[in-house]
Swiss-Prot record:
One Pfam family per UniProt: His_biosynth
Domain of life: Bacteria
Family, as annotated: Belongs to the HisA/HisF family.
Record-level GO cellular component terms: cytoplasm
PANTHER family to which the protein is assigned, alphabetical: 1-(5-PHOSPHORIBOSYL)-5-[(5-PHOSPHORIBOSYLAMINO)METHYLIDENEAMINO] IMIDAZOLE-4-CARBOXAMIDE ISOMERASE
Catalytic function, reaction form: 1-(5-phospho-beta-D-ribosyl)-5-[(5-phospho-beta-D-ribosylamino)methylideneamino]imidazole-4-carboxamide = 5-[(5-phospho-1-deoxy-D-ribulos-1-ylimino)methylamino]-1-(5-phospho-beta-D-ribosyl)imidazole-4-carboxamide
Biological process according to GO: L-histidine biosynthetic process; L-tryptophan biosynthetic process
Descriptive protein name: 1-(5-phosphoribosyl)-5-[(5-phosphoribosylamino)methylideneamino] imidazole-4-carboxamide isomerase
Family matches, as HAMAP family: HisA
Subcellular location: Cytoplasm
Organism ancestry: Bacteria, Bacillati, Cyanobacteriota, Cyanophyceae, Synechococcales
Gene field: hisA
Coiled coil: none
Amino acid sequence: MEIIPAIDLLDGACVRLHQGDYDQVTRFSDDPVAQALSWQSQGAKRLHLVDLDGAKRGEPANDAAVRAIANALDIPVQLGGGVRSIERAEDLLNCGLERVILGTVAIEQPDLVQVLAERHPGSVVVGIDANKGKVATRGWLEQSDVLATDLARRFSDSGIAAIITTDIATDGTLAGPNLDALREMAQASSVPVIASGGIGCMADLLSLLPLEDQGVSGVIVGRALYDGRIDLAEAIGAIGDDRLQDITCGSTDLA
């Protein structure tokens, strides 16, 4: 299973929000390039970026940092947040990003997702951010009536590379992942599902392993890495693709 460190960008700095609340911001670093290089040096195989300003306003606000990170790293970089047009998505791919993540437009302009997936195979990911099972959009500031699982089914055969599913209720809380919601998403999707939200310790990461065979291929980790609750290199060794053995749910190693 792939462990993907997250860098959330707000006003050019690395931050984390609590349950997506822009009024509950924790600032971790003023140098996102140095932070990105640190995750790479610790063994990350991919980096996840979020333009929080872009997600909120619908227009890019951290492009200087995004481009600097893409140019500095040797590993693939993906970005979500405010990617709401073909032109914006292709600009990001042309500047060195491996993948773009489409969230709001997946609800509002589903045909755009299809077009981009056909033009750029393997480079388009759909981000499904859910609150009580229903999709939230525009930086989580608006709530739709669309079920997250229905949206996953809608794009399963569209040629996208993966679905990133974020449980808003647990995001930034360190309270553990919503395993039931993850299982439902994996069952609804025929493409790999990447989990996001709630990871607070190694036991949380290990709890995802039984879902790997059901289609959960990776996990995005943010606050737990910044707080030092999880060591990235250790986590990669425990649940990464090169791990020595699987650890079952009932194992005492989860303690």
